[in-house]
Amino acid sequence: MRVVVIGAGVIGLSTALCIHELYHSALQPLDMTIYADRFTPLTNTDVAAGLWQPYLSDPSNPQEADWSRQTFNHLLSHIHSPSAEKMGLALISGYNLFRKAVPDPSWKDTVLGFRKLTLRELDMFPGYSYGWFNTSLILDGRSYLQWLTKRLTERGVKLFQRKVESFDEVAGGGVDVIVNCTGVWASALQPDPLLQPGRGQIIKVDAPWVKHFIITHDPESGIYKSPYIIPGVFNGTVGGIFKRGDYPEGNASENHSCCQTGCSGPHWRTKDARIVGEWTGFRPVRPQIRLGREQLSAGPSKTEVIHNYGHGGYGLTIHWGCALEAAKLFGKILEEKKSSRMPPSHL
């Protein structure tokens, strides 16, 4: 069976690996190819802050909460393994801060040691009157993509740098299944009015003295628009920019100033941090993740397409659960193909 995965960010590579791990023994051979116009270190995943934390509000699709939980448990199972260092995986603790009381998040029992902040702790953060503390996971995107790539190539999966302009150009080569993990660019392959780019700009800093993540929340501003700093495995990430429908890739000076000013208070402790770099990326924003299948006609034959995109700014948080779901869809395709080849019963 021939399978093509389009996209080489965390969604594309993890989905490819999950499908290959679950079905390579049942399909001999399983010929899998990954096409992408950008590979690590040039993907959005490479510069993501990497903290496992879903949105505070419940997702409109309840399955998304399950996919995030599955991802946390999958990563946590690796935390004491020899692979953790190569994956760029570590435990991290920190604070979510608010100006007024808010309901507990649905993921409070997924993370470790979730609790409300004490008054003494809140004294460390002037201007904030409510908050949480918990231990979560941090995943360095670049290290993780390299780890996934190595596992895929060891399995014989082929990776090619190629910009796919349409499903037809891939399906025409005798491909049985296409897995669409193109993120914010999915509309170029098939129009999707629900998909929008959510432009973000972050600053990477060398601040080894910052040991805990600090994420502030302002419901009036919306998600991603409040200051945050997230220590990483190698460098910290300073941010707080989100512009929906904005495509320019260059760094904007006003956004740089916004990030720096927002994280300039005494509790941020980033004033003297050395700036390592600054990046702009696009979150594939959609009301719900598109994770489903459809059939496309390519001449006389039909090609199955599994869509897996629209993860917003939390692809690393939800990737493995989505990969498992995509693999289930792949399994259903196999069952249907097997049934269609069975001779009819004469009973």
UniProtKB/Swiss-Prot annotation:
Phosphorylated in the cerebellum; probably not by PRKACA, PRKCA or PRKCE. May be S-nitrosylated, which partially inactivates the enzyme. The keyword Translocase does not apply. It comes from the Eukaryota. FAD binds at residues 8-11, 37-38, 43, 45, 49-51, 163-164, 182, 283, 312-313, 315-317. InterPro entries: D-amino_acid_oxidase_CS, DAO, FAD-dep_OxRdtase. It comes from Oryctolagus cuniculus. Interacts with BSN (via coiled region); the interaction is direct and inhibits DAO enzyme activity. It is an enzyme of class 1 (oxidoreductase). Residues 216-228 are annotated as: Active site lid that may open upon substrate/product migration in and out of the active site and close to increase the hydrophobicity of the active site, to make the hydride transfer reaction more efficient. Catalyzes the oxidative deamination of D-amino acids with broad substrate specificity. Required to catabolize D-amino acids synthesized endogenously, of gastrointestinal bacterial origin or obtained from the diet, and to use these as nutrients. Regulates the level of D-amino acid neurotransmitters in the brain, such as D-serine, a co-agonist of N-methyl D-aspartate (NMDA) receptors, and may modulate synaptic transmission. Catalyzes the first step of the racemization of D-DOPA to L-DOPA, for possible use in an alternative dopamine biosynthesis pathway. D-dopa binds at residues 53, 283, 313. It is found in: Peroxisome matrix; Cytoplasm, Cytosol; Presynaptic active zone; Secreted. D-serine binds at residues 224, 228, 283, 313. Keywords: Cell projection, Cytoplasm, FAD, Flavoprotein, Oxidoreductase, Peroxisome, Phosphoprotein, S-nitrosylation, Secreted, Synapse. GO terms for molecular function: D-amino-acid dehydrogenase activity; D-amino-acid oxidase activity; FAD binding; glycine oxidase activity; identical protein binding. This is D-amino-acid oxidase. GO terms for cellular component: cell projection; cytosol; extracellular space; mitochondrial outer membrane; peroxisomal matrix; peroxisome; presynaptic active zone. Its EC number is 1.4.3.3. GO terms for biological process: D-alanine catabolic process; D-serine catabolic process; digestion; dopamine biosynthetic process; L-leucine metabolic process; neutrophil-mediated killing of gram-negative bacterium; proline catabolic process. Belongs to the DAMOX/DASOX family. A motif (Microbody targeting signal) lies at residues 345-347. Residues 1-16 are annotated as: Required for protein stability. D-proline binds at residues 228, 283, 313. It catalyses: a D-alpha-amino acid + O2 + H2O = a 2-oxocarboxylate + H2O2 + NH4(+); D-alanine + O2 + H2O = pyruvate + H2O2 + NH4(+); D-cysteine + O2 + H2O = 2-oxo-3-sulfanylpropanoate + H2O2 + NH4(+); D-dopa + O2 + H2O = 3-(3,4-dihydroxyphenyl)pyruvate + H2O2 + NH4(+). The gene is DAO. Its cofactor is FAD.
